[in-house]
A protein has these predicted regions:
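Ubiquitin-like/PB1-type beta-grasp interaction modules and other compact soluble beta-rich domains
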Residues: 1-64
Length: 65
């Protein structure tokens, strides 16, 4: 299926947000995941299904001083 990830069209066979992020080397626990304009929180990442045309973004949280 085709989705938009970080603003770019991407082809994937992953069926969940977590499975797709794993193919991209992204650990959802280290940031914030947004699917179709809504935040996907915590454990919901593993249970949330992807669909054709989904818009997915992942933001890494960086802190320091």
């Amino acid at each position: 299926m085709k989705i938009r990830y970080q603003g770019k069209e991407t082809e994937t066979g992953a069926d969940t947000v977590a499975a797709f992020l794993a193919t991209q080397g992204v650990d959802a626990a280290e940031g914030v995941v947004e699917l179709d304009g809504e935040i996907v929180a915590g454990d919901a990442v593993a249970a949330t299904s992807l669909h054709e045309g989904a818009e997915l973004n992942a933001f890494r949280i960086v802190a320091g001083g």
